[in-house]
């Protein structure tokens, strides 16, 4: 009996050790599989977010902090559904949409998506131009050209060295963004009590209600919704139903949670910096004015880090936006063109705006209007497709997820209508 118990104990110990080693190996592999969501998350820390969050913090202090948190949670759900669609169906969102349409409708859908891609480029290129102007005192036009060129080089990294290296470069830029926008906390720390109060949903007059609607409505970016499905598919392929797919979906959920948490921290930091240092400053109507205010209140070093964060945001988001544009064209039209030509198509409007001396702040505002028009065309089909059992099989959305998805899709679409109205009337 003693010998048998000993053998049994040794057997259990061996199996336990093997299980532990297997779990550890799986965890290591899971960390290796992370990345697509970090690329998509760049859309949530672009120059448009900088302007919106800084403006909110400067006007209302900590009041809108809960809005930023809610917006990132809603965006996280949408991004997961997009990645899930790619893994389960083996199609990007543009490809899946195109198969539901006749040719004329598909062409029209592509035209609006292409306008969204161009509007995205305007925001990123203008933001990069402003950052280069702040850091190196070059003209806005030259700054825009440099931003476009660097973004093209980043895309060449993807084409020649693969998606994994591209993801690592973009993730590196994301952490530069984190440092750039959180460094001010080493000089001025936010009040924990005020932060807790800022997490309590409430408003302060009609203007705060409208601004909250604008923040949520401007958070979900259509190009990121299209892109994430393609990123997940390119990175993980189309796994067969079963253990492999379930594991990749778990990894994808972790990927989205981590990436959107980082994006949420950055957006929160933008608002808190403004709430602590820029309240009552009449400088937040344009990004360069925000830099000046930070320099006056926190010093040249923190202001420089802010500008570097803005530059990293612009470079990363410009390359990710161009990647999304190529994915959209390939998915909807079933054709692709060389990346250089593709990049020039979407880059030209942004460079033309800078060359003509158009006010960069107004260009950012107008680009957000165009982006707002594109939101329903990306989010509503996504929820419908991921709830299609014929397409998704056993991985179709849970009924609760479907209800929440439709609620988010309709809410974000309506809030973008509000955003358009507010922008036009102001």
Swiss-Prot record:
It holds the Pfam family Nramp. One of its GO terms (biological process) is iron ion transmembrane transport. It is found in: Cell membrane. NCBIfam families: Nramp_1, PRK00701.1. One of its GO terms (molecular function) is manganese ion transmembrane transporter activity. The keyword Transmembrane applies. The keyword Secreted does not apply. The gene is mntH. It comes from Mycobacterium leprae (strain TN). Keywords: Cell membrane, Ion transport, Membrane, Symport, Transmembrane, Transmembrane helix, Transport. The chain crosses the membrane at residues 31-51, 58-78, 134-156, 169-189, 208-228, 256-276, 298-318, 337-357, 363-383, 402-422. It is a multi-pass membrane protein. H(+)-stimulated, divalent metal cation uptake system. InterPro entries: NRAMP_fam. One of its GO terms (cellular component) is plasma membrane. This is Divalent metal cation transporter MntH. Belongs to the NRAMP family.
